[in-house]
Amino acid sequence: MKLLNDSRMQEFIVNGYVKVKAAFTPAFHESVRAQVEEIFSTTGNPGNDILPAIPQLADLFSHPAVTGALTSILGPGYAMHPHRHCHLTPPRQAGQRHHQDSYEDDQNVRHHRTRWVMAFYYPQDVNVEMGPTSVLPASQYYTRRDQAEKQEEVLLSGEAGAVTIVHYDLWHRAATNHSDRNRYMIKFLFCRMAEPNAPSWQCASPVWSEPAAYEELPRLWRSVWNWHLGNELRDDGQDDASRVGVSAGRRDNGLRVEQEVLSEAGQLENVYQLSGQGPKGSAELCERLSKEALELLDHNQAARHTNPSQLYSGFGLSAQGATAVPYLLELLRTGDWPLRAAVADILGDIGRPAGNAVPFLIDSLDDDSEWVRRNAAEALGNIGSAEPVPQLARLLVKDSCRFVRHNAALSLAKIGRDADAASSSLQMALDDTNLYVRENARLALARIHME
């Protein structure tokens, strides 16, 4: 297995993608391309069935360069998600608009910490004329198109066997195919199954190196780097306000800022700045969160594939780790449903340091709000405690919402062997009406019983 080094790992954190080469023979990739072409011409796009239709694709994701990159980014024991797709751009087809992919069968909050990635594989040489996949580097932390499109587009041309590992939220598109040849790209999804407790790449130094090409999100990048290291380190938040895209304004004890947010980047850097200010920062961020949860609700629910818990303050609270948990638990007890849902999500993004929240998240599994139950079920898997296994098992077979069942099954898979008591419920879930609930249950059973 060929792990990433510090430089390439930091490149991924900043740019949102890293390219590797599955160096099989040209005949291997040509065989895949020919089979894809045959399938499209006879039965159409196979969707999720591309892997059983072309079993040799499994060899691709066993290649040392590919497994090394995925292990470096997602940690050991990562899982291939059952959703996959083969993208065809025929000759002369116009390019797409830049977009972020929706999360398959759940509208997850877009998080900065890397728990999901995509892998883009070319089974043939793709030059710039053929409409390669295009990415906007360093755009994965933005939800606003106007901010993302400030980044300079990069066309991912490459030889057959090129595999690009992409942060799930990176803005991307298929470019225009100006050639007379079909262009194929096969997309696979991968999911982190355990929170980091040490570097999973070839780490020579824990020191973060500021990138030369970008400068807008230094605190965010350092926070994500430290999370990947398995640390809860935070910077002190004392940089000059001009570095984070806010006007200086009035400060109360160096905390409260009467700010004019100049950009989404500035807003993100501001909440990461507050994350470094201890309990005072927690109080300020929770106050903002309470307002955002209601003020942004209509906006967050207006479009498809969105989550009402997509709130800027949540990123700062996640970065605070255990410091923020007591403040969040108070909101979980007292807030309206949009706020309760946001808090459940943030506790899950904090992960293991939010272990004290487990009993409260278990209670949230019975919340009247589907969104609270969805986010609480997901959060418990990230925290990884075995305590909620009986409640997650009950949810898996009894909750009427497929998204809740989906998240319950995936969380049981993350808990792994300690979820053995849920085995009978997981067996029942193999007959669920939803494909992804069934597949997550299958994954959970495999992880419970793996040697």
Residue ranges of model-derived segments:
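Conserved metal-binding segment of the jelly-roll/cupin
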Residues: 158-172
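Alpha-solenoid HEAT/Armadillo-like helical repeat scaffolds in large eukaryotic proteins
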Residues: 256-261, 284-304, 327-335, 360-368, ...
